[in-house]
Amino acid sequence: MTTATGKVNLLGLTQPQLEQFFESIGEKRFRAGQVMKWIHHFGVDDFDAMTNVGKALREKLKAFAEIRGPEIVSQDISADGTRKWVVRVASGSCVETVYIPQGGRGTLCVSSQAGCALDCSFCSTGKQGFNSDLSAAEVIGQVWIANKSFGTVPAKIDRAITNVVMMGMGEPLLNFDNVVAAMNIMMDDLGYGISKRKVTLSTSGVVPMIDKLGEVIDVSLALSLHAPNDELRNRLVPINKKYPLTMLLDACRRYISRLGEKRVLTVEYTLLKDVNDQPEHAEQMIALLKDTPCKINLIPFNPFPHSGYERPSNNAIRRFQDLLHKGGFNVTVRTTRGDDIDAACGQLVGQVMDRTRRSERYIAVRQLAESESAANRN
């Protein structure tokens, strides 16, 4: 990708693309591996820091290329350790990246678009509409920024980022080429060396692109389902009017069958009080998914202003989970993380919170967590 400076941004180039770039400037293809390792393993954005690259080539790179990531606007840390970065992309829009630590695993939730065109009724990102696709550099740049923030390199066993999920702002399959390029860099040993099983793309159901995805890359697939019948899903996830459930699940099964290796589909289901959390919805879901190798992730709704929806009670959540368990499914309930910094699922809107209000909220939540911890010890 050529930036506003007229130079090629090397950050978003896959290894084959980097090889082509070096050939285009009269250099050997092996230089791609050297430079790619500097960029992604060590977070370098200055060609002069590349000590195994000769001075003449470094000067040529300065003339034709640059390494430019998104601009960090703010970083917040939740009381539970969740981190959220707000970054500004070339279009001027802001997007959000969220890091969720849990046990020995660290999951980075990456955005693919500024805003979203799908307008799912329970998601705050969709309420702002679509602004722009992110370039491959802006997608992988979120991993690059987070990795640098933690001061780790991919070769380390104890690296902070072990999993990446394309579940941030936007519909990844509507920014297909750039997202695929970024995921290839994530999995490349010269990039971040993340296992294909630990890179997950989440889609609301762009059926033709699910089939195309299976032809070009091997990553885990998650489906944002949220309703067990077409009538309700048409209302909650409007793209269902174009690609109804029968068509959508057929595409998901085709994708999973291509992967083999006992891979399964992750089904995401946001629970909305008195909307999709009733026993009949669980029974419909069991019937809908009976022929689909899958695990189900229930997501209690994370409130945001003017959404019109509420989070179900804990009893309602447990009841729904138990019914699915009895139906033979592996079911987990996602623990809400980062809601004190608006980093929970469905809350990403690319806004920068007022610093004073942000600090007050963080302190209040931290104090609450500390008091609850002390009470539990007593």
From Swiss-Prot:
One of its GO terms (molecular function) is metal ion binding. It comes from the Bacteria. Signal peptide: none annotated. Its cofactor is [4Fe-4S] cluster. Residues 102-342 form the Radical SAM core domain. Binds 1 [4Fe-4S] cluster. The cluster is coordinated with 3 cysteines and an exchangeable S-adenosyl-L-methionine. GO terms for cellular component: cytoplasm. Disulfide bonds join 109-345. S-adenosyl-L-methionine binds at residues 170-171, 202, 224-226, 302. Gene3D superfamilies: 1.10.150.530, Aldolase class I. Specifically methylates position 2 of adenine 2503 in 23S rRNA and position 2 of adenine 37 in tRNAs. m2A2503 modification seems to play a crucial role in the proofreading step occurring at the peptidyl transferase center and thus would serve to optimize ribosomal fidelity. This is Dual-specificity RNA methyltransferase RlmN. It comes from Pseudomonas paraeruginosa (strain DSM 24068 / PA7). The lineage of its organism: Bacteria, Pseudomonadati, Pseudomonadota, Gammaproteobacteria, Pseudomonadales. The gene is rlmN.
